[in-house]
Amino acid sequence: MKRTQLLPQKNLAQTCAKCHSDAGFLSRHQIPVAHPVESYEQSVHGRAIAAGSGQAANCNNCHGNHDIQPAREAESRVNHWRVSQTCAQCHKEIAKTYEESIHGVAVKSGVKDSPVCTDCHGEHLILGPKNPASPVNAANVSAETCGRCHASARMAKLYDLPADRVPSYADSYHGLALKGGKMTAANCASCHGVHNIFRSADARSTVNTANLGKTCGQCHKGADEARYAIGPIHVQTGAGPNHPVVKWIRWTYWVLIPMTLGFMLLHNLLDLLTKLIRRRPRHESSEVALRMNLQFRIAHWGIMASFPTLVVTGFALKYPDSWWARPLLMWESNAGVRGGLHRVAAIVMLLATAYHFIHLAMKKRDRAFVWAMLPGIKDATDMVHVFAYNLGFTKKEPTFAKFNYAEKMEYWAFMWGTVVMALSGFMLWFNNFSLRHFPKWVSDAATAVHWYEALLATFSILIWHFYLVIFDPMVYPMDTAWLNGKIPADHYRHSRPEYFRTLKRAGLVELPSELSGYEDEQGTAVTSGNDPSGKT
């Protein structure tokens, strides 16, 4: 198709605008496209013309001169079946590539729903891919452009297309990171190609099994140089066709999380109601007892600073549209603040945990803490006793040893969770290593574990830990042991009488002013009673 030009380039759009910018004209002739000239002038073509380019497309290059036909007519240059030929006047190689692609072949076969150039790039308002308003901008291509067809239930049913591709991508790390502003995250075109899209079974396809290493290697350096273990790319968040291990992990957590949180809510609600109804005085004296020496408090401070940071920065990836996530993600396109903070917080938590164990290893007297934290038969009977007391089956108030079952459960759950989150987190952090040395389902399993364990840990802290150190009527409004290491002696006098007598004999139950010097001089005298997490 030969390009012709009858009027100076800069004047042609304004000539067409005399009619096509007239609302009355558009209405009378039932022309549905509003503001075509204004849109064109803002496009890459219109701006190039305005800048003096003689090569950019003008109205007549696409619509013709005196042979202009409505788009519905087969002879029209902008008819759906002829669009790629019209664009080929300038974009010859791209048009050739497109016509060989799955979309181009489908158009030639008469599939009217198969996209042509204007379906993806627009018609009059064609913008460059770096323009945030462009439908082929990295932020828009998956959800708005590809998603318009591949997320359509009608299209999926009519052409037997997989209906899960767009939602599974949107819920993946790539989709969530892109939605959160990380423009370097992979989108549909990053993997499937732009104009050169083929069926995955086609050897030319960038997502063909033989080519996946090279495709993924664009971002994951080394993936195309080593044994790249290929697996399903679009991983389901529900009970879809995933690897059996990933399915098993999800089903396990779907049962574990509601059961665990339900138990916590029931336990704390019964305890709260019982204490509110019986209203025993919290403090009968002004005596205080040493709860946490400085070493335990340092470890707790590190965990206390890192855990909320991990929660906020982690959930900001999963819920990038949340109001609380936006201030954090506003820097994501350039600096990657969220991910950086998340990893720093993870290191801080691991260092705090390591500090705790180094402290126990170096302080012989404090090592008794570990033995005191081990669960035993008494913890099970204590739990039964607490439920019986809170339900009114017994009037005898339960008493405990140095640590009660609630503190032991939280301590060991924290240690287990830290190990699980660290292992899964490092696999995701060093994803190139993981993808080179393990099957892809291992990374998918790590993603599932990291997500569900984060949910469990977050709600456990909110429900279990916050009740123990804030909302329990016996400590409300806050257990201050994490600040100064001390708690009211009555906390032990009533609920842990044997341990209270041990503290008393050691001289660690005194008036506040008298106890101030004990932390450094005698703080380890009965450290089997110290609690590194501040969970009281």
Please provide the spans of the model-predicted regions.
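Short sequence/structural segments immediately N-terminal
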Residues: 1-291, 324, 329-334, 356-367
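Membrane-embedded alpha-helical bundles that constitute the cytochrome b-like, heme-associated redox core
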Residues: 212-218, 222-536
